Amino acid sequence: MFHMSWIDRAVARENEILRIIKSFGKSKLEFILVGGYAVSALARQRFSVDCDVVIPKNLAKKFEELLRKEGYKVGQTKAGFDEAYGGEFASFRKKVGDLPVTIDLLIGSLVSRGTSASWSYQYIKENSVNATLITGKESLEVSVPEKELLVAFKIHAGREADLRDIVMLTHGLDLGKVRKHTQRGEMSKVREHIASELKSLNNPKVVLSLKGVYEIGGDTSESVSRAARLLENLTKST
């Protein structure tokens, strides 16, 4: 009996996610890609096991109908997702081989559970850009939050994975925009996140994990320094 390798299974899962993103576009459904795939489109490709999209509230039923038609079922909310995001969302799951594929719909807004900050779909749309998502041999035009807004989401989420993404997104950032997008929710908690993230940037394990997740062979010290400067500047103004 033929057994797929772990890499083959992971690629099959990624291909399924790309297929679903394409099907949203073909169905003329409006959405903005956030999470790991948005980072891949704006910075450097990184492995992501699920797909997060922010959608207009009035299209929620159409998205759900399409996903059900494609064999997805309403799944249990993942703990990681639950820790990071609040607000209204629906999580859909399907198995590809023996690996689960998860599509998370953030309905009407993106809400940071840890800081109670909220960004409406309209706000995200007004601060989004078109980008090319490239995975393997596939490429796809998608709408994603501009870098500065994506960094703000990551600062509010405050997990180690988010800090790695911040490091990868810091090239050519507009500090004023990051500040504007970040200043919402419980600012005392935002300041705590920034202080914790600055401390983590001095941890060699974080740099090593950065290289692993993004498959970077070279020196990352410049990117880490840029991220530290960004967070230090935000500390002065938040």
Mark where each language-model region is.
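Compositionally biased terminal segments of proteins
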Residues: 1-238
